[in-house]
């Protein structure tokens, strides 16, 4: 939202009134989540929940990792107008360059999080039929959707719409066709 406001208004003064401090703190927070496995040169983010709240405590949620990169890049872009400490700048450059950003597989589909494609691939209706109570929560450790590819909201579709210049139309269409039938379209309000 900050970058949309600045790009629309040209009001860079907002950076001196707390906005730059806010986005720097967001970048530091995301940086604090990064881990690097011994056998990898890439940073990963583990144990998160993306917009799809049916799958909790996942690793490398594509949406979360891409948003972290966006925050790193935003701080670096704004550093032209708002000077950064060299150590922080180098840390954010390293984070942006080396964070794991999921790529499309051979079918053009981006995996929502590590292990998503290994989950049971069933329809939303099949999962709905497993409910004991119609008001039962689908997610969490014991939810009926937790071990399936059925999702509450399509993280990948949201990510692609936010960063559409990074992907081809074909990749966007392929992912929409893959994820839409697996999306339950539950309320974006938690639980």
Region roles according to the model:
Residues 1-17, 28-97:
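The feature captures the catalytic groove of carbohydrate-active enzymes
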Residues 4-8, 17, 73, 77-80, ...:
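Active-site core of glycosidic bond-cleaving carbohydrate-active enzymes
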Residues 15, 22-25, 190:
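Short, glycine/acidic-rich beta->alpha junctions
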Residues 23, 28-33, 152, 172-176:
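Structured mid-domain segments that build the active-site/substrate or prosthetic-cofactor binding neighborhood
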């Amino acid at each position: 939202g900050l970058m949309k406001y600045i790009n629309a208004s040209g009001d860079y003064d907002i950076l001196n009134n707390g906005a730059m401090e806010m986005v720097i703190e967001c970048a530091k927070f995301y940086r604090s989540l990064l881990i690097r496995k011994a056998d990898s040169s890439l940073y990963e983010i583990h144990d998160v929940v993306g917009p799809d709240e049916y799958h909790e405590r996942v690793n490398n949620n594509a949406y979360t990792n891409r948003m972290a990169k966006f925050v790193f890049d935003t701080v670096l872009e704004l550093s032209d107008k708002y000077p950064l400490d060299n150590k922080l700048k180098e840390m954010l450059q390293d984070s942006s360059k080396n964070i794991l950003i999921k790529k499309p597989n051979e079918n053009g589909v981006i995996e929502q999080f590590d292990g998503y494609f290994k989950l049971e691939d069933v329809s939303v209706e099949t999962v709905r039929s497993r409910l004991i109570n119609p008001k039962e929560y689908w997610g969490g450790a014991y939810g009926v959707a937790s071990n399936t590819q059925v999702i509450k909201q399509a993280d990948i579709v949201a990510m692609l719409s936010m960063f559409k210049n990074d992907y081809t139309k074909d990749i966007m269409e392929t992912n929409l066709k893959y994820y839409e039938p697996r999306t339950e379209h539950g309320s974006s309000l938690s639980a």
